[in-house]
Amino acid sequence: MNCNDYPMYGFADKAEVLDAARKYWNPDKTDFWVNEGIPLVIGKREGYVLEDIDGKSFIDMHLNGGTFNLGHRNPEIVDTLKDALERVDVGNHHFATSGRAALAKALIETVPGNTMGKVVFGSCGGEAVDVAIKSARFATGRKKIVSVIKACHGHTGLSIATGDDRFLKMFNCSRPDEFAHVPFNDIDAMERALSGNDVAAVIMETIPATYGFPMPAPGYLAQVKALCEKHGALYIADEVQTGLGRTVDFWCFEHHGITPDIVVTSKGLSDGIYPISATILNERAAKWLYEDGFAHMATFGGSELGCAVALKTIEITRRAETVEHVKALDVLYSKRFAELLEKHPSLTEVRHDGTIAGLKFQGEDEPAVRFCKLL
């Protein structure tokens, strides 16, 4: 791999790194992977390949949940950051900058139909979801948020309440009067949740990622959007893991025939080079920005370095050759997955759209775990 040696920061080997991680960082997460037989400490990384610090190479099919869509350490994006560092830093979030204005304009222009009006920047997806929820509550004067059971929209203050009970209970974040959860692809359950006309917004990943990438049933998302309009709620499309060209279209919701009121993006927006997130709002959702622009502040939100990197990421993603490459991968994966389904009876279902894929196996966890270890 053509990249610099990975810094060890004084540790002699992997065992020392893992011991320090247990002691000073996260004992449960460290031991989880070790006990599963995956004692991975990522060292060198480039393109779609990464190395354990012991030298074993892996094809990175996880990509940190869609963070490295254009590959680890994409040379064009690295050069963009280096160039920006010669002239700017994170800047001051209180004042307008050319980079922030340019990125906001570029993001608004990615959403079809000229429907979006403003962009609020942050540094991670959870923060962007928090902004989306606050915007919807201000716009509607309502408090209740509806999400999908087993969803994951982040782990910050408001976003965690939209997700798995496992984390809500741990941090005493359950708020059943404010946050409701319904099964994915169950339009009747969604209608019941909205029928009280007290919901500020429905938030959905276009394809729920940590839920195993179940595909939306034909027409389901359009029906949800129609219910939102009927009952006065906003529709928040969480495209943190499904957007930025991963399903051929720039945003996954485009080929489901919907126009969200709010779009959330992060992760791959900077291809893993500099943290940045964005909450894209239509004019209704952006009303609070006219009343009190200081109502949400983030020191590193829309940093000048992050904006430079994100602009380059969008430019590369929208190139014709990038789009054609994703189309070709979509066709290739469809063919190969069909062959795998025919060849391996333990594989019962493939959930696939563009470069996104989830594989369902017979039984509970064991076949899937065994498959992952073989990789």
Regions found by a protein language model. Give the residues of each.
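Conserved N-terminal phosphate-binding loop of PLP-dependent enzymes in the Aspartate aminotransferase
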Residues: M1-L375
